[in-house]
Amino acid sequence: MIMKALVLEKAGKIAIQDWQSNEVLGDDDVEIKIHTVGICGSDVHYYQHGRIGPFVVDEPMVLGHEASGVITAAGKNVKHLKVGDRVCMEPGIPDLQSPQSRAGIYNLDPAVRFWATPPIDGCLRESVIHPAAFTFKLPDNVSFAQGAMVEPLAIGMQSATKAGIKPGDIGLVIGAGTIGIITQSALAGGCSDVIICDVFDEKLKVAEKYQGLHAVNSKDQQALADKVRELTGGEGVNVLFECSGAKPVIASISDHIAPGGTAVLVGMPIDPAPLDIVAAQAKEVTFKTILRYANMYPRTIRLLSSGKLNVAPLLSATYKFKDSVEAYERAAEPVRLM
């Protein structure tokens, strides 16, 4: 089947093209007409650099992995979904027989096929065929745009869960880009206050719209240190989420953490990053790392439906599919949230 798709040909070059899909509807699959696709930081990384760490774009690849749409066909074994249902899709398809999947950590399955992670094509196209087990019905009060945001929110949920947040904890989020959505998950997880820092005031203005968030421009490191001291009585934050992937930040990640605190590494540096091990040892910092999520979509959808996760301020613009190239060019500007 030939359809229109947004294809990354190589670093810096994308175009809408006729694309051949070889997907076949299986008994346990659904076919989905794509309605809304978000632009993630990883999409922009691939667009700009053609790689993230070991994941290298060696041949043309369809972009996009944050999506929602409408079911247009369902396999004979699918009982919980039907044609016409509004849905969002978890973009990773693991081997359900792998040791990791059987242990409930299917996000770590080495054989997982994840949309828009080389060499797997993404979902910025007219339709997809996807396992029904990784397709989730949207409540009536959750829009298509919110449905597309479930994917990055799920990363926040995974991060907040692994951080082991306790009621009343103080959190610090470094990096106010799309993945900085984690701040909402930290608040929902029990943090009484969350400091969020970035070097772009435009991003911080978005963060300021959320109650309980304290936005600080980290160009002024003294201002950041003062805010941490003010909220923690000089102890340091209980949990820190590193969402920037910036090597200088990772090197000094222990500076603002309380003794015995936790650092969650969420952002992905393009290249290996140094870390001050001794500084971390001196505080016995616990490090947690995040690779996507597992079993977080149902929880995230419930929180969206309840109104406890508000993504409206994070939706900066909406583009028609025919304007996808322009949308990516805009998203590649350093101050944009999409």
Curated annotation (Swiss-Prot):
Q: Give the matching PROSITE patterns.
A: ADH_ZINC
Instruction: Please name the GO terms that the record assigns under molecular function.
Output: D-xylulose reductase activity; zinc ion binding
Which catalytic reaction applies to this protein? xylitol + NAD(+) = D-xylulose + NADH + H(+)
The organism's superkingdom is given as Bacteria
Residues in a coiled coil are: none
Top-tier EC class? oxidoreductase
- Please list the residues that bind Zn(2+): 40, 65, 151
The answer on whether this UniProt entry bears the keyword Ligase reads: no
Q: Which SMART domains match?
A: PKS_ER
Cofactor comment in the record? Binds 1 zinc ion per subunit.
Which InterPro entries does this chain map to?
ADH-like_C, ADH-like_N, ADH_Zn_CS, GroES-like_sf, NAD(P)-bd_dom_sf, PKS_ER, SDH-like
Pfam families given for it? ADH_N, ADH_zinc_N
Q: What EC identifiers does the entry list?
A: 1.1.1.9
Its required cofactor(s), as named, are: Zn(2+)
Task: Kindly state which keywords UniProt assigns to this record, in alphabetical order.
Answer: Metal-binding, NAD, Oxidoreductase, Zinc
Q: Which family does it belong to?
A: Belongs to the zinc-containing alcohol dehydrogenase family.
User: What binding partners and quaternary form does the record give?
Assistant: Homotetramer.
Protein name (record): D-xylulose reductase
